Amino acid sequence: MTTRQHSSFAIVFILGLLAMLMPLSIDMYLPALPVISAQFGVPAGSTQMTLSTYILGFALGQLIYGPMADSFGRKPVVLGGTLVFAAAAVACALANTIDQLIVMRFFHGLAAAAASVVINALMRDIYPKEEFSRMMSFVMLVTTIAPLMAPIVGGWVLVWLSWHYIFWILALAAILASAMIFFLIKETLPPERRQPFHIRTTIGNFAALFRHKRVLSYMLASGFSFAGMFSFLSAGPFVYIEINHVAPENFGYYFALNIVFLFVMTIFNSRFVRRIGALNMFRSGLWIQFIMAAWMVISALLGLGFWSLVVGVAAFVGCVSMVSSNAMAVILDEFPHMAGTASSLAGTFRFGIGAIVGALLSLATFNSAWPMIWSIAFCATSSILFCLYASRPKKR
């Protein structure tokens, strides 16, 4: 193995471990949602808001960290964000009311955004478009370990300890990640390539992205794809645990099926993206999600049972990494000179739409799985429509 291959492996592995923080802070927490509702004596919608505010903070944080990463470099931004993430996790563990937890989760998400933005920008500094998509697939492959194990670990933490310890574990993980960043990650943006941090320049860069209708459509399509998955993350614990009577400690095993599909589709993407291109892989992922959403609606109408929903959700979620990595590859290829800003806006759309959809879904009454199913179907349809709009022939 060459030095370059060793270096690539090390970068992918470290960034994959760093990227675990975001899914860990959601997926380990999912089995605790019904328990937290009962402990604080609040309805399911109030507890779901702790997820929505986390995603909202994550979305807004992208707008902050992207321009900062283009101006001050990648390493100081991600290191600072990860340390704040650890502090916010401690604050969540010490929350005494649901309102305190909702507020602290917002700051938790705000800090978590640093890693997401910097990982995308750092990888784009190193790799061209098709190689970027391939290497990002491997980052996401490493990251799948977290959501595979997180709900299982979270469920057993609930059995043996309490939901507070979930956040103590997250704080410890963030401190370890900070040490890896400090000692093992090198700066990839030299000073001569950095953009001055001026509000006018930042606004101008965002305006350039908004004027690019095709790229904007890809951002929206990717955003609704993620929002479909977030519909499950927000409502799934209640649909599985309360409506279908899955034990909290067993929820993680059902969730693991999603990760199996995610693993398979990530491998599929890494094998074929060089052959058929990032854009075609992106479109394929969206169409698979649309078909799976239609399957969930039809199977619910026909009363095909709980497992038809479980499989449909798993296949839908399995395509998220393929959609996200290829969408980011296409978007950053258009704006390589401001990869941090472009990555931040794409992330804001992805997680902002997820936060809005999750907040609206929290208003629903969960006597059945229908609110979640309709939300997923709406998001999948929206993704396809934006993708079709972006694929229209250019006017001469």
From Swiss-Prot:
<feature type="transmembrane region" description="Helical">
    <location>
        <begin position="9"/>
        <end position="26"/>
    </location>
</feature>
<feature type="topological domain" description="Periplasmic">
    <location>
        <begin position="367"/>
        <end position="372"/>
    </location>
</feature>
<feature type="transmembrane region" description="Helical">
    <location>
        <begin position="286"/>
        <end position="302"/>
    </location>
</feature>
<feature type="topological domain" description="Periplasmic">
    <location>
        <begin position="160"/>
        <end position="165"/>
    </location>
</feature>
<feature type="topological domain" description="Cytoplasmic">
    <location>
        <begin position="123"/>
        <end position="137"/>
    </location>
</feature>
<dbReference type="GO" id="GO:0046677">
    <property type="term" value="P:response to antibiotic"/>
</dbReference>
<dbReference type="InterPro" id="IPR020846">
    <property type="entry name" value="MFS_dom"/>
</dbReference>
<feature type="topological domain" description="Cytoplasmic">
    <location>
        <begin position="333"/>
        <end position="344"/>
    </location>
</feature>
<dbReference type="Pfam" id="PF07690">
    <property type="entry name" value="MFS_1"/>
</dbReference>
<dbReference type="InterPro" id="IPR011701">
    <property type="entry name" value="MFS"/>
</dbReference>
<feature type="transmembrane region" description="Helical">
    <location>
        <begin position="373"/>
        <end position="390"/>
    </location>
</feature>
<feature type="topological domain" description="Periplasmic">
    <location>
        <begin position="99"/>
        <end position="105"/>
    </location>
</feature>
<feature type="topological domain" description="Cytoplasmic">
    <location>
        <begin position="66"/>
        <end position="76"/>
    </location>
</feature>
<dbReference type="GO" id="GO:0005886">
    <property type="term" value="C:plasma membrane"/>
</dbReference>
<feature type="topological domain" description="Periplasmic">
    <location>
        <begin position="240"/>
        <end position="250"/>
    </location>
</feature>
<feature type="topological domain" description="Periplasmic">
    <location>
        <begin position="303"/>
        <end position="308"/>
    </location>
</feature>
<keyword id="KW-0812">Transmembrane</keyword>
<feature type="transmembrane region" description="Helical">
    <location>
        <begin position="309"/>
        <end position="332"/>
    </location>
</feature>
<dbReference type="GO" id="GO:0015385">
    <property type="term" value="F:sodium:proton antiporter activity"/>
</dbReference>
<keyword id="KW-0813">Transport</keyword>
<feature type="transmembrane region" description="Helical">
    <location>
        <begin position="345"/>
        <end position="366"/>
    </location>
</feature>
<dbReference type="GO" id="GO:0033229">
    <property type="term" value="F:cysteine transmembrane transporter activity"/>
</dbReference>
<keyword id="KW-0046">Antibiotic resistance</keyword>
<feature type="transmembrane region" description="Helical">
    <location>
        <begin position="106"/>
        <end position="122"/>
    </location>
</feature>
<keyword id="KW-1133">Transmembrane helix</keyword>
<feature type="topological domain" description="Periplasmic">
    <location>
        <begin position="27"/>
        <end position="48"/>
    </location>
</feature>
<dbReference type="GO" id="GO:0035442">
    <property type="term" value="P:dipeptide transmembrane transport"/>
</dbReference>
<dbReference type="GO" id="GO:0042910">
    <property type="term" value="F:xenobiotic transmembrane transporter activity"/>
</dbReference>
<feature type="transmembrane region" description="Helical">
    <location>
        <begin position="251"/>
        <end position="268"/>
    </location>
</feature>
<dbReference type="InterPro" id="IPR004812">
    <property type="entry name" value="Efflux_drug-R_Bcr/CmlA"/>
</dbReference>
<comment type="similarity">
    <text>Belongs to the major facilitator superfamily. Bcr/CmlA family.</text>
</comment>
<feature type="transmembrane region" description="Helical">
    <location>
        <begin position="215"/>
        <end position="239"/>
    </location>
</feature>
<feature type="transmembrane region" description="Helical">
    <location>
        <begin position="49"/>
        <end position="65"/>
    </location>
</feature>
<keyword id="KW-0472">Membrane</keyword>
<dbReference type="GO" id="GO:0071916">
    <property type="term" value="F:dipeptide transmembrane transporter activity"/>
</dbReference>
<feature type="topological domain" description="Cytoplasmic">
    <location>
        <begin position="269"/>
        <end position="285"/>
    </location>
</feature>
<dbReference type="InterPro" id="IPR004734">
    <property type="entry name" value="Multidrug-R"/>
</dbReference>
<dbReference type="InterPro" id="IPR036259">
    <property type="entry name" value="MFS_trans_sf"/>
</dbReference>
<feature type="topological domain" description="Cytoplasmic">
    <location>
        <begin position="1"/>
        <end position="8"/>
    </location>
</feature>
<comment type="function">
    <text>Involved in sulfonamide (sulfathiazole) and bicyclomycin resistance. Probable membrane translocase. A transporter able to export peptides. When overexpressed, allows cells deleted for multiple peptidases (pepA, pepB, pepD and pepN) to grow in the presence of dipeptides Ala-Gln or Gly-Tyr which otherwise inhibit growth. Cells overexpressing this protein have decreased intracellular levels of Ala-Gln dipeptide, and in a system that produces the Ala-Gln dipeptide overproduction of this protein increases export of the dipeptide.</text>
</comment>
<dbReference type="GO" id="GO:0033228">
    <property type="term" value="P:cysteine export across plasma membrane"/>
</dbReference>
<keyword id="KW-0997">Cell inner membrane</keyword>
